[in-house]
Amino acid sequence: DKNEAPAEGAPPADAGAASTDGPTYLLVPMRGVIGEDVLADGLVSVIAFAKRSGVKHIVLEIDSPGGLASEGRRIGEIMRDARKEVTFTAYVKSALSAAVIPAISSHRIFYEPEAQIGAAVAYRWVPETGAAEVDEKFLSALAATMAAMAESSGLNGDIVRAMVIPRLAVYAWSTAGGDVVVSAESPPAGAKDARTVDDAKGVLTLTARQASDLRFGELVGEAGIDGLGERVDAPGWRLYSNYGETAMRRASSVQEEAQQARDRFESVASTLGALVRRAVSEDPHGRVKLYYEA
């Protein structure tokens, strides 16, 4: 079954299909919250399956409001380590907050017409106040990490920094040759088409059209994912199997079950603690012996 991973060391399902029937890809749905619905462990399984099956392309379908920055960074690191063996293509519907990371870690980004990307500012929970606050040091480190990820994919690092750090201005202008320059530095005097991309009043979010105009990815054509093969040097590519969806769903299910087990443990521990405290209060000198039967 091509939707299930072959055993380690065993011949992959449909081995050789990519070489005889043209290029193939695996589709990885990244829908929902990073760290809950979208987990790095699922992507690890998909990459391993792709390598064993001879699949060279992985398409990340991103439609996420964000989530845990730590899980997003782990996803980015996994992609970085595999990018010489697998080509990642981001198909973006919405990539906000931590969901920006898998997009900028891909070799290419393509946007649906109504897509958006950005707003990657991170907050930390402060138990003393019960509020979420911006941690400037963490943001600075995260911005540097994400900018490096973007630049390794040929994207502009200043755009990413503006998505992470509030109050960071970004400008754009055109050269005499028609190239678009995007920078945190002010445009030179007389620069052509000079404009402010982000006015430093908040974190940057780009529409699909804005991102395309700034060379921060490309717009998807009417053919959608099926039509992207021509643009990523895999003409006529086809979906190899549904294993990508299977793996991501399985990883999320495992985490949910683990969380339920932790919740049950905490509930039992709380109940036992209350019973012990009651027993101690009613028998402070420990005269009553307690026996437990298996």
List the model feature ranges, each with a label.
Residues 36-56:
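A short, well-ordered alpha-helical element
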Residues 64-75, 79-127, 134-138, 142-145, ...:
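Glycine-rich beta-to-alpha active-site loop
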Residues 19-41:
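STAS-typified acidic loop motif
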Residues 1-24:
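Compositionally biased, proline/threonine/alanine/serine-rich low-complexity intrinsically disordered stretches
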